[in-house]
């Protein structure tokens, strides 16, 4: 289970895009797709049946979830997430450094 969710703002902590920030677009198992990060070039063949034009496309690719960390909105630094049950009995995600509740998108 991933502690990051779609809509979270993350910072890349390792790899060619280290230091860049973006919003999570998708989470699959232990991989994550971040807006504007890990751009790769894809060669698309044209397909008349589906109406897809061919060409060279640039798109985001998945990267391993260990290479990103959630961005703490108050400190603007990478942080980790912990869980705690609130007074209403629901599980909440908290920043580990200051204990503030993570804003969900």
From Swiss-Prot:
GO cellular component, one term: ribonucleoprotein complex
SMART domains on file: KOW
InterPro entries membership: KOW, Rib_uL2_dom2, Ribosomal_uL24, Ribosomal_uL24_CS, Ribosomal_uL24_KOW, Translation_prot_SH3-like_sf
Keyword rRNA-binding: yes
Any GO molecular function: structural constituent of ribosome
Pfam families associated with the record: KOW (PF00467), ribosomal_L24 (PF17136)
CDD domains (alphabetical): KOW_RPL26
Keywords of this entry: Ribonucleoprotein, Ribosomal protein, RNA-binding, rRNA-binding
Role played: One of two assembly initiator proteins, it binds directly to the 5'-end of the 23S rRNA, where it nucleates assembly of the 50S subunit.
Subunit structure: Part of the 50S ribosomal subunit.
Record-linked NCBIfam families: rplX_bact
PANTHER family xref list: MITOCHONDRIAL RIBOSOMAL PROTEIN L24
Family: Belongs to the universal ribosomal protein uL24 family.
Protein name, as recorded: Large ribosomal subunit protein uL24
Organism (species): Psychrobacter cryohalolentis (strain ATCC BAA-1226 / DSM 17306 / VKM B-2378 / K5)
Lineage: Bacteria, Pseudomonadati, Pseudomonadota, Gammaproteobacteria, Moraxellales
């Amino acid at each position: 289970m991933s502690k990051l969710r779609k809509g979270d703002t993350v910072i890349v902590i390792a790899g060619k895009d280290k230091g860049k920030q973006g919003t999570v677009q998708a989470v699959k198992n232990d991989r994550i797709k971040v807006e504007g990060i890990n751009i790769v070039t894809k060669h698309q063949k044209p397909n008349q049946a589906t109406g897809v034009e061919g060409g060279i496309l640039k798109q985001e690719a998945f990267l391993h979830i260990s290479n990103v960390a959630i961005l703490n909105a108050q400190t603007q630094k990478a942080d980790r997430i912990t869980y705690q049950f609130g007074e209403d009995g629901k599980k909440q995600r908290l920043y580990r450094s200051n204990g503030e509740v993570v804003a969900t998108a």
